[in-house]
């Protein structure tokens, strides 16, 4: 659920969750079920909407819009809350699907939009910022337990420093990439953010409460 839309206020809020009791509980469940431990949450940017030919300035403009989403239930529910037609497509097929008009648009962080050259097949960049994207640093629990105290301390310090650098670097890149994508021919739109946010927050937390655990959303959102 840590990549759910509108869960995090900003990157600092997401990072703060990494040292919270509720995150510690989630971590122990991951260790128990998978033998893996989350060591850090890093920032990979805000996800934004892009469109091929339609100017989208509010969620009302999404009615009937064929939006490519990853094959993940929360992304599908988000698109449907906006009134769009959620269309799951694997990322390696996305460029072709956009170029052929199989879908009207997609959503991704700015580094992904740039590296995948989506400006070649999308005209508008709509700065929705609907998801603060996390990237997790995960390690095998058995391997961690095999480290000496000294080596574990070195590892933890390296991860903390790397995560801090990653967060700052991605923030810097985001500022640069809007200009880069504009230069590449995209039109930048600053939409009515509340029109996107409101229907998602009304629908998703109750819809996924059983899956996420009662009270989990509220606890994380309140940090």
What are these regions (language model features)?
Residues 1-13, 22, 28-223:
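N-terminal secretory/targeting leader peptides
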């Amino acid at each position: 659920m840590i990549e759910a839309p509108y869960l995090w206020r900003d990157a600092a809020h997401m990072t703060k969750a990494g040292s919270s009791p509720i995150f510690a509980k989630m971590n122990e469940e991951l260790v128990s079920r998978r033998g893996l431990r989350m060591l850090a949450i890093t920032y990979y940017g805000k996800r934004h909407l892009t469109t091929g030919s339609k100017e989208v300035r509010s969620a009302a403009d999404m009615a009937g819009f064929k939006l490519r989403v990853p094959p993940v239930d929360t992304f599908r529910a988000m698109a449907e809350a906006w009134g769009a037609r959620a269309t799951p497509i694997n990322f390696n097929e996305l460029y072709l699907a956009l170029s052929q008009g199989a879908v009207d648009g997609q959503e991704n962080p700015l580094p992904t939009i740039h590296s995948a050259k989506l400006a070649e097949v999308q005209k508008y960049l709509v700065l929705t910022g609907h998801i603060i994207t996390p990237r997790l640093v995960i390690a095998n629990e058995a391997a961690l337990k095999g480290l000496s105290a000294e080596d574990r301390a070195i590892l933890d310090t390296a991860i903390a420093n790397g995560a801090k650098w990653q967060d700052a670097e991605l923030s810097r890149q985001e500022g640069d990439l809007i200009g880069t994508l504009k230069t590449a021919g995209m039109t930048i739109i600053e939409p009515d953010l509340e029109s996107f946010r409101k229907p998602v927050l009304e629908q998703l937390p109750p819809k996924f409460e059983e899956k996420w655990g009662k009270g989990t959303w509220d606890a994380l959102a309140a940090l």
